[in-house]
């Protein structure tokens, strides 16, 4: 048996390791168009900010160590540019432009997602970055050092955007955050995001909500960011953290079915519409366990779980069904901890689902004990059955209840 895996970060690397554990004899080939595999995406902002001092700590495995440990043929800087399902072959392009073909018995797609980069005037100017991989991290780190950056604009206030805002701030950079929506951190409700807004402002971050960027202009003095309101923000660098989209180009080329939400369609066994081709990670869509509606979930833990399940299905046949994930996440925003799981009230309202919510304002521990910190928890649930739909928590550094919410 010959297995080919396309994409070597979260789901792909996990699947390769699991394949070797359950199948000691077959050939496993792992293709990655970048230079690195199996790295810690969530740690990238903290390396840029100097919290993580050693770059090597981001790399869970190198291509060489992974290949030797699991007896996997790891081919970095080898981009799969075409899949031919009828012939069970792929076309690969190397870094020097050479093309070749490989056959497979079963294939796994784990291409991840690509950053949203709208076609705005000036967006390709020097000093405007996205952050998605180790190469992006190196470019940003070098630019910060070589250009003595003093002012930065972060466009987008999701997890990566706010983590970058914090780390740039800690590095002595004056930070402005521009967000098109009326709040930061879209998975949580506005009422839970409001204290985060106050905290960011207290820390010295300039926050522009319900603002969109119209264009950028590069001058000798730096970059000017033009907003829809007519305001301008001067900057030495810009980080685009607008969001990501499933990387589906290869799947579309192969004629695989794309779902309603824009991700690669898979069945309960994570097999695509083509026999013997499976898919995992940020590129797939899957029914939400609470609603049955197709959705996209850009988180590492579900991708890793999918990787383990799909490896078993590729070896033993489609026997293990993936139960789905509800989008559990946790993030640090300066001194605050923000956690959420399941469906927020605004999402339930959007999907016209009957619900009630409960908000509790408490403390991280008993008030009579020193250093108690404010803690807010919000639950969403069905008003009749009491079925829990979701939970959100905001607290302060050192508060473990938000962490426990995340693990629940």
Where are these regions (language model features)?
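Mid-to-C-terminal Rossmann-like scaffold of FAD/NAD(P)H-dependent oxidoreductases
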Residues: 1, 283-399
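Beta1-alpha1 glycine-rich phosphate/pyrophosphate-binding loop at the start
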Residues: 1-73, 116, 165-188, 400
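Short hydrophobic core segments
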Residues: 6, 80, 102-112, 155, ...
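A Rossmann-like FAD-binding core segment of flavoenzymes
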Residues: 25-27, 69, 75-96, 101-102, ...
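Rossmann-like dinucleotide-binding cores of NAD(P)H-dependent redox enzymes
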Residues: 59, 151-152, 159-217, 297-303, ...
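Glycine-rich dinucleotide-binding loop and its adjacent helix/turn
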Residues: 109-171, 206, 260, 266-268
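FAD-site-proximal beta/loop scaffold in flavoenzymes
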Residues: 124-148, 224-226, 231-312, 404
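Residue-level detector of conserved catalytic or cofactor/ligand-binding positions
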Residues: 399-407
């Amino acid at each position: 048996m010959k297995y080919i895996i396309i994409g070597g970060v979260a789901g792909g690397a996990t699947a390769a390791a699991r394949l070797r554990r359950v199948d000691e004899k077959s050939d496993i080939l792992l293709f990655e168009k970048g230079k690195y595999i199996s790295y810690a995406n969530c740690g990238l902002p903290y390396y840029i900010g100097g919290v993580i001092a050693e770059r090597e700590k981001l790399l869970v495995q190198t291509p060489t160590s992974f290949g030797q440990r699991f007896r996997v043929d790891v081919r970095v800087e080898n981009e799969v540019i075409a899949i031919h399902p009828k012939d069970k072959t792929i076309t690969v392009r190397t870094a020097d432009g050479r093309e070749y073909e490989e056959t497979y018995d079963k294939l796994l797609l784990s291409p991840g997602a690509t950053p949203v980069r709208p076609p705005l005037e000036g967006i390709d100017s020097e000093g405007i970055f996205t952050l998605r991989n180790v190469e992006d991290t190196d470019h940003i780190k070098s630019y910060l050092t070589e250009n003595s950056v003093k002012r930065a604009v972060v466009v987008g206030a999701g997890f990566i955007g706010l983590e970058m805002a914090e780390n740039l701030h800690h590095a002595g950079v004056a930070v402005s955050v521009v967000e098109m929506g009326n709040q930061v951190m879209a998975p949580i409700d506005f009422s839970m995001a409001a204290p985060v807004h106050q905290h960011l402002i207290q820390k010295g971050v300039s926050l522009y909500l319900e603002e969109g960027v119209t264009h950028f202009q590069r001058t000798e003095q730096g970059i000017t960011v033009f907003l829809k309101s007519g305001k301008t923000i001067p900057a030495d660098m810009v980080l685009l953290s607008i969001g990501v989209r499933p990387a589906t180009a290869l799947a579309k080329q192969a004629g695989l079915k794309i779902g309603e939400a824009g991700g690669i369609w898979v069945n309960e066994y994570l097999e695509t519409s083509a026999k013997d081709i499976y898919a995992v990670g940020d590129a797939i869509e899957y029914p939400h366990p609470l609603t049955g509606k197709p959705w996209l979930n850009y988180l590492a833990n579900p991708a890793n779980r999918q990787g383990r399940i799909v490896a078993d299905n590729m070896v033993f046949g489609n026997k293990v069904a993936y139960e789905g994930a509800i989008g559990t996440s946790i993030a640090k925003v300066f001194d605050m901890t923000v956690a959420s799981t399941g469906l927020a009230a605004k999402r339930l309202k959007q999907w016209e689902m009957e619900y009630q919510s409960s908000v509790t304002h408490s403390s991280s521990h008993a008030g009579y004990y020193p250093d108690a910190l404010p803690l807010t928890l919000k639950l969403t649930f069905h008003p009749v059955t009491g079925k829990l739909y979701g939970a959100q928590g905001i607290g302060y550094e050192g508060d473990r209840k938000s962490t426990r919410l995340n693990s629940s």
